[in-house]
Amino acid sequence: VTWCRGAAYYTESGWRGSLKTEGGGVLINQSVHTQDLLCFLLGDPTTVDATMTNHHLKDVIEVEDTLEAYIDFNGVHASFYATTSYCADVAPLIEIACENMTIRVEDPHVTVYPKDAAPYQLSVETLPPIGKSYWGTGHTACISDFYQSLRDNRRFSLNLETMEPSIRLMLGTYESARSGHSVTLIEQ
């Protein structure tokens, strides 16, 4: 997740950039949904080793503007990077390297790069994004699914139980970055 947030973004709000009112920086505000997607795609995270820093707004905010983490999903490893010190707002990128292919997700595009064949794009049905284009289409899909669950009289697919791995990962990422040590999220 590489986005651009200048001083005005923080100073013109009454809560951004403060640990007390925001709870954190780039992870909890800009990139938590990318961690959500990693949990959705890779399963329950088991350990995380993270670092965080404030590179470009040291005199403006007290939270991190850059965070990186090495996450283990029960033997599947992920490298996670997020910053608000980039020069532009770019759609989040998730790349999954498998034995025989690499899958690249850049909302709303999914491209498959087979090991021994030409790359191709998967057809993904999406709704128009809400807000800025680099926010992606996930919010629109989530809101649409919520309303559809009400119409269908079914349980909404996202709840505390389904989001627990993602919340555990976010909190563990912060704990690891603050302590300087790897954090075990669930015993294997």
Describe each model-derived feature in a short phrase:
Residues 1-60, 180:
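Predominantly a Rossmann-like dinucleotide-binding segment in NAD(P)-dependent oxidoreductases
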Residues 23-25, 130-134, 152-156:
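Active-site rim elements
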Residues 57-64, 73-141, 159, 187:
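NAD(P)-dinucleotide binding in Rossmann-like oxidoreductases
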Residues 147-188:
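C-terminal helix-rich "cap/oligomerization" subdomain common to oxidoreductases
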